[in-house]
Amino acid sequence: MADPMGGAGRLPAVFMTPGTSSFTDFLSQSAPHLLPGARGGLPGPVTEVAHGTTIVAVTFPGGVIMAGDRRATQGHMIAQRDVEKVHHADDFSCVGYAGTAGVGAELIRLFQVELEHYEKIEGATLSLDAKANRLAAMVKGNLPMALQGLAVVPLFAGYDPDLDKGRIFSYDIAAAKSEERTYESIGSGSVFAKGSLKKRFRVDLTQDDAVRIAVEALYDAADDDSATGGPDTIRKLYPIVASVTSDGYRRYGDDEVEPVVTAIIADRSTSAGG
């Protein structure tokens, strides 16, 4: 019987064969069963799984802010109160997800490895457009699972050094990619979040202003959508907030987000209409 390891102390031949710089393509050739979309053939639609809810992204001159609530739901139940749905993609981009929590987390981990693998193989980073296209291909690969109820859609944002600005890309479950010029929201509370952003967005926002209206949009979404979690001041659970600028990716600490939440609550206390 042939040794699958190619002999004692040797890597399998697949690791030694020159090929693509895409980790996803490599995985599809060497271990396709590990890809998120390769586990189709379920007996029927799946419903009793945790779902992540609302993500928002807002551009400002020189960068972009992304923020996400912390709630995951399972039917009418709160499955988790401290989910992290906004993540570092690479040094100059971030990604969030809405939909099936397990599939979303797996998709993001694979995307992070995809970008890191390309950089190590090629010695250069992908352009922001190329990163967005790679993510679209991965979303398309999950389509069989999405059609059986395990849908997930990402929101991707980053800093484009060629244009010196932040950019936002959204997707549907069939991997159609759209660039959003100013702001975007995905998830169950997105219609309320976008309504909030529409009222408050300005082209001359400062970075602090962008953080404020992103958190406020999540607050508005939570006010009308039961699947979106608002700031939990008792448990000290606040939205995940990240920025991407020419200085790179930065996640805001809870000690930075808490004063923003406190100011919003104080303002709402004196202006009940929001």
UniProtKB/Swiss-Prot annotation:
Domain of life: Bacteria
Propeptide intervals in chain numbering: 1-52
Catalysed reactions listed for this entry: Cleavage of peptide bonds with very broad specificity
SUPFAM superfamilies linked to this entry: N-terminal nucleophile aminohydrolases (Ntn hydrolases) (SSF56235)
Activity regulation information from UniProt: The formation of the proteasomal ATPase ARC-20S proteasome complex, likely via the docking of the C-termini of ARC into the intersubunit pockets in the alpha-rings, may trigger opening of the gate for substrate entry. Interconversion between the open-gate and close-gate conformations leads to a dynamic regulation of the 20S proteasome proteolysis activity.
This protein's UniProt keywords: Autocatalytic cleavage, Cytoplasm, Hydrolase, Protease, Proteasome, Threonine protease, Zymogen
Cleavable signal peptide: none
Gene Ontology cellular-component terms listed: cytoplasm; proteasome core complex, beta-subunit complex
Primary subcellular site in the record, as a coarse category: cytoplasm
Biological role: Component of the proteasome core, a large protease complex with broad specificity involved in protein degradation.
Name the record gives this protein: Proteasome subunit beta
